[in-house]
Amino acid sequence: MAKSQAGQTVEPEASKLWIHCNSCCALFCDKKHTFFLLACHHVFCERCVKVSAGRTPSDAPIFECSTCRRSVRGRQLTNSMPNHFKQLFHPEPFTIGNDFVETFQRGNHRHFDKYKERKELEMDKLFKDIEVAKSVCQKRFLEAQMLRVERKKLMQRSRYIKAEVANRKAEMHRMAQAYRSRSLTSQSSSSAQRSARGRPRGRGTATQSSSRRRSTESAKRQQITSFIHPPNNSFDL
């Protein structure tokens, strides 16, 4: 769409919408580029046509047509172009009774319609790709949400297990300390009892053995042979 001097957008005339670059399909009515009509009756914008100088300085420039691959002359599309060239872009070609003008415009219409059909197919494909991408994104988003919930549960479970392991370790440490303290206490008490019992036993045993030896020796020394005394059976005769 063209813009007026006041900055307001102005809708282009429908009769000019078919004028386009035969290579990139840029519209003439957008007024963004300079357009040329070549002698081979192809229309191009300044970006899609190669221009070279003529044979002499006063000679017209030579254009390289990218459609028919020929070096031809050309004219810039302006209101000041010759009338027989300007008639090719007449808004009502059916009124001038020129079959070539109608054929020229009809060919450009078909070319631009094919371009629009290609763009519509591309747009349809893009819309389908967008829908597929949206469904895939929604699926991935739901999966990501489920994974976040699962991750949260696993983190809570991990914290619980870590706390449980720490409590078990602390309990085992306390039990080991209590066992060591009990074993040390029992060892000290048993050693004290053994030391207390061992000393009197040694002395008493030696005293008993010495007294036994003395008694046996005294018994041996005191044995004396004497009469055998029969039992006294007293009775009356």
Swiss-Prot record:
Zinc finger (RING-type): 21-69
Tissue: Expressed in nurse cell and pro-oocytes (at protein level).
Residue runs in coiled coils: none
Pfam family, one: zf-RING_5
More about this protein: The name 'vilya' derives from the fact that this protein contains a RING-type zinc finger and vilya is the mightiest of the three rings of power given by the elves of Eregion in J.R.R. Tolkien's books.
Region spans: Disordered: 172-237
InterPro entries for this protein: Zip3/RNF212-like, Znf_RING, Znf_RING/FYVE/PHD, Znf_RING_CS
Any one of the GO BP annotations: female meiotic nuclear division
Disruption phenotype: High levels of X chromosome non-disjunction at the first meiotic division, severe failure to initiate DNA double-strand breaks in oocytes in early pachytene and complete failure of meiotic recombination.
Membrane spanning stretches: none
Biased composition (Low complexity): 180-195
Biased composition annotated in UniProt, kind: Polar residues: 221-237
Cellular component terms (Gene Ontology): central element; chromosome; recombination nodule; site of double-strand break; synaptonemal complex
Name of the protein: RING finger protein vilya
Binding partners and assembly: May interact with itself and with narya and nenya through their RING-type zinc fingers.
Main location: nucleus
Keywords: Chromosome, Meiosis, Metal-binding, Zinc, Zinc-finger
Upper taxonomic lineage: Eukaryota, Metazoa, Ecdysozoa, Arthropoda, Hexapoda
SUPFAM superfamilies, sorted: RING/U-box (SSF57850)
Source organism: Drosophila melanogaster
Record function comment: Required for the formation of DNA double-strand breaks during meiosis together with narya and nenya.
